[in-house]
Amino acid sequence: MMLGAELVTETVQNIIDGKVTPIPQEQMHTDEPLRPAPKIFRETCEIKWSEHTVDTAHNFVRGLSPYPGAWTTLLSPDGKETVMKIYRTTKEACTKTAQDCPTLLPSANSDKTLRIALPGGILHIHELQLAGKKRMNASDFLRGTSLEGWKVNCD
């Protein structure tokens, strides 16, 4: 965010000083015509864990947050599925992580995040929303929920 703030300040100053010449989009010289971005559907926002490393999963969440929001399904020990939207994550590089299906790690970590082991590291979930509930911090979620026996749906 700091880089963006510096860039905005620098750009505004260059405009004030007359160092920037604006070019209308219609006059830009490109080899390809401009294309609109593809429409995002609910299915597009599902995190398909088997297709992601820790880096791509983190970037997927960032790209869809805050709206429409990336989501996944958690499986309870009795087989019940729960939809969870994920809004904010960080990543931790780690050599010993999941190779095939991602693993939901126990919540006994100091920063109180929901952790998922993926190829290339651990994804720390900081903000989430369960179906029918309000958006919450992972620490609040973990205080009221025992995740023993829960799994991430990796189908």
What does each model-found stretch correspond to?
Residues 58-155:
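C-terminal active-site/capping subdomain that shapes the small-molecule cofactor and substrate pocket
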Residues 1-92:
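Active-site-proximal loop/hinge segments within enzyme catalytic domains
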